[in-house]
């Protein structure tokens, strides 16, 4: 399975990137998956009302993001929680890529959402992004699904080191792996050949 991990924090060495690296380590324990990470450190998508993303003049960051996303069967967003909501870069990305020019990014995909916190938060950004992505899937009449299981990465900096290696409490490791397993199972069921829309 092709899997894109999208770390939506623009901070250098963010907790969201730690989590994305952790998921990559878990997924590559076997050779069953091709995994890519996109880091929002060089984010340059204009905000709605200030410009748009043009297919024929993508920046390096935009090209990296769109290439990883369009080649993926499963797209996992890792989002920091800012004041009980998702970061603006995350939702703006969906708004800017949710139109006709990039409709294919929402076709025959499984999406999964992870909220990242250095405390006990994380739920709200995952819920916010679930709502926005579901709306785009519905509005564009696309055949994709957002996996119903969210993950809240609590005390991320205490459980994962800067390279995404697990260093923390066994409950974190157990619940994170359960989320990954569940997400993979949903993806395998959703992407079964008899369910994929014939073009």
For each predicted feature, which ranges?
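Hydrophobic alpha-helical membrane-association signature
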Residues: 19-20, 125, 129, 179
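N-terminal beta1-alpha1 ligand-phosphate binding loop
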Residues: 2-31
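Helix-loop-strand module that forms the ligand-binding subsite of alpha/beta enzymes
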Residues: 57-137
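Short hydrophobic segments within beta-strands
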Residues: 6-8, 38, 114
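N-terminal beta-loop-helix "entrance" segment that forms/cooperates
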Residues: 40-57
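A generic structural motif
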Residues: 30-36, 139-140
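Glycine-rich phosphate/pyrophosphate-binding loop and the adjoining helix
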Residues: 142-199
